[in-house]
Swiss-Prot record:
Origin superkingdom: Eukaryota
Function in brief: During primary cilia disassembly, involved in cilia disassembly. Required specifically to control cilia retraction as well as the liberation and duplication of the basal body/centrosome. May act by stimulating AURKA activity at the basal body in a cell cycle-dependent manner.
A Gene Ontology molecular function term of the record: cytoskeletal protein binding
Keyword line: Cilium biogenesis/degradation, Cytoplasm, Cytoplasmic vesicle, Golgi apparatus
Localization of this protein: Cytoplasmic vesicle; Golgi apparatus, trans-Golgi network; Cytoplasm
Subunit details: Interacts with proteins involved in ciliary transport, including ARL13B, CETN1, KIF3A, RAB6A, RAB8A, TUBB1 and TUBG1. Interacts with AURKA.
A single GO cellular-component term on record: trans-Golgi network
Source organism of the structure: Bos taurus
Protein name: Ciliary microtubule-associated protein 3
Coiled-coil intervals: none
Length: 192
């Protein structure tokens, strides 16, 4: 008698009499459920029969987000990581590059030496900064120090010097005098 009941139960596999959550309509709250979302909506409805406003509704987005019932499981998240892009609008030729009324200039943080400086510098028109045509090229200054000479040797009578002293030590005034004399000889190159 026990064997006859066992033979009748063999036709059914374990758990088939109960209502089971199968994948295409239900999903687990882990990594597999986040990757493969279940089918939602009415199965006999065609692709052009959906309402576009329904996809932007709060209730629709809450129903679409996979959530974890028992806290956070391994790989389960409360929201989709990458949201799907809206493909309702077909791009037209002018959509790829938008028209910017204000031209944007991007200044890089680091650049090679002297590449960020302007190409042509702007100089002021002040009379302190003369232009290229304002110089007098007719007058050429001598580049040699003029020194009083007599037959190839210096004319010491025309060179200013101090009176002779019996003491051979050099005083600070003598040193200043020689500095002043040498400066005058140098400046006579440029100013006569």
């Amino acid at each position: 008698m026990c064997f006859s009941q066992a033979e009748t139960l063999v036709n059914y596999s374990f758990g088939t009499c109960q209502h089971r959550k199968i994948f295409p309509h239900f999903f687990p709250s882990d990594l597999l459920g986040n990757k493969f979302l279940p089918i939602r909506g009415v199965p006999h409805r065609g692709p052009g029969c959906y309402i576009a406003e329904e996809s932007k509704d709060l209730a629709y987005s809450l129903a679409k987000i996979p959530t974890s019932i028992k806290g956070y499981g391994f790989g389960a998240r409360t929201a989709v990581r990458f949201k799907p892009k809206n493909k309702d609008v077909t791009p037209y030729p002018g959509m790829y590059q938008t028209v910017n009324l204000q031209e944007q200039t991007h200044k890089p943080n680091f650049a090679p030496f002297n590449t960020l400086s302007p190409r042509f510098r702007t100089y002021s028109k002040d009379p302190c900064y003369p232009g290229p045509g304002t110089y007098k090229l007719e007058k050429k200054e001598p580049q040699k120090v003029t020194w009083p000479m007599k037959f190839g040797s210096p004319d010491w009578s025309q060179v200013p010097c101090l009176q002779k002293r019996t003491l051979k030590t050099e005083l600070s005034t003598d040193k200043d005098f020689r500095k002043h004399r040498n400066r005058l000889a140098y400046l006579s190159l440029y100013y006569n």
